[in-house]
Amino acid sequence: MSSNILAMVAMQLLLIRIVSSQNVTNEYLNHQCNNTQGTYTRGSTFEKNLNQVIRNISHLHLRYGYTYNSNVEAYEVSKDPNIVFVLLQCRGDSYGSKCHSCLHTAFSGLRERCRGNKGAIIWYDQCVLEISSVNTKGRIRYDSFFNMTNVKNVSSNAEQFKNKRKDLFHKLLLGATKDVSDSNDAYAVGETRIGRNKMYAMMQCALDLTTNGCYVCLEWIIGRYDSFYFDRRQGTRVLSRSCSLRYELYPFLRR
């Protein structure tokens, strides 16, 4: 009897650990509901088109963790209020089945948090999902930026921290903004030692941006948040629909 109880307790602890791990690795981060694009009702043509686009994406391989999809071909210009555009960009280490999983989590979260909105964006740790009635492909969405910072400040060797961080950022900026091809997915990661610590960092752009657009987007983040956050905090992440950046004094990516 006691052995059965121990086995049940062990299984419960294992399930708790698995669920906790999943929550940490793909936690909800933020959402934005766009009220300017109007709303749709349950069972409407817009909702049917949206569901169909999501189903279509579900059948894609998502080898590079990205798609920009619509229910119309060539993203034609139209005043049809039922056209749907969907962007899915998964984090560079979350592709294939991991990206599919994040898609379904994000779509469910978006429908709950922005119920009936034709335009909305939601961020999870492993992906960003945007639905829209307007074609946003290739645009830098400056209105979508937000930041999350580590509560701990840099307490010592501040000048060394700043210099090392800037060198690493420069390296990753160049890596993420090479010509996009099968060998480069607008995603760069790296690390550098700062005294006894290591800094881990990543930069990524949505693959609908051009190489120049990616550079402009990441440069905008660095310029806007540089002195106030990056030189003071032990870790910060800045996210948007178009590009993202993160650094921490602990590893946060999949190996």
UniProtKB/Swiss-Prot annotation:
Protein keywords: Repeat, Secreted, Signal
> Has UniProt tagged this entry with the keyword Signal?
yes
Major location (coarse): secreted
Q: Which top-level group of life is the source organism from?
A: Eukaryota
State the CDD domains in the record.
Answer: Gnk2-like
Residue ranges of domain Gnk2-homologous in the record: 28-136, 142-252
The record ties this protein, via Pfam families, to: Stress-antifung
Q: GO cellular component terms?
A: extracellular region
As recorded in UniProt, coiled-coil segments are: none
Q: Which residues are the signal sequence here?
A: 1-21
Which ranges does the record mark as transmembrane?
A: none
Disulfide-linked positions: none
Q: Where in the cell is it found?
A: Secreted
Q: Which InterPro entries match?
A: CRR_secretory_protein, GNK2, GNK2_sf
Q: Which family does it belong to?
A: Belongs to the cysteine-rich repeat secretory protein family.
List, alphabetically, the PANTHER family matched: CYSTEINE-RICH REPEAT SECRETORY PROTEIN 26-RELATED, CYSTEINE-RICH REPEAT SECRETORY PROTEIN 38-RELATED
State the name under which the record lists this protein: Putative cysteine-rich repeat secretory protein 13
Taxon lineage: Eukaryota, Viridiplantae, Streptophyta, Embryophyta, Tracheophyta
